[in-house]
Amino acid sequence: SGKIGGKEKTQDLFRYLDDSGNDYDIKAEHINDYLERHMQHRYTAKDFRTWAASWKTAARLAMVSDASEAQIKKLPKLHQEAVENSEETGFPPYIRWEGRTLKGTEGLAKLAESGKLPGEGEKERSATMLAVIDTVAADLGNTRAVCRSSYIRPMFMNDWESGVFMERWNKAKSGKRRGVELLADENTAINYMRKHEDDEFQFSKN
């Protein structure tokens, strides 16, 4: 198949050869049909990408906000080492920081080096949010703009910029456990949304 990796619905996402050497392609519609058949609901691959982008953004904003000064000071060196390793291996750079694997950390490293992470003023907090979004966009293989406009739940970004995010996130951490299959950060994100999505709806209506 010569169409692997394109953005059109007719493009192939994967291909494989069976034991007889027959060449098969897998398109987005095949994956979405599989999800619907096995989940018995009309979910698509984009739903999963949207969810991943949303909870990761929220969790990483919280992680950066909770990080100590010593932890933040590690970021520039970790990023530089990751870039150097990438030049040797040919793989995209990534770091391990506070138990998480992060890609696209150039923005975080620059803010940490200048002492502006997580930031106190509106401008610095906005820069922190954009740097966090860069790490999520790197996971998804999208640009910051696409990730921000099409995948991340606006509630988390709006609350961060208005200064209420961390209070709400910390309260959501002690909320109901909604499934053993969920990561702790996913569970917190669900509690957060369940609690505040009505507030967001009312805000958008006014």
Predicted regions and their residues:
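Extended accessory and catalytic-adjacent subdomains in large enzymes
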Residues: S1-A82, R96, G107-D198, Q202-N206
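Charged, low-complexity interaction regions
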Residues: E87-R96
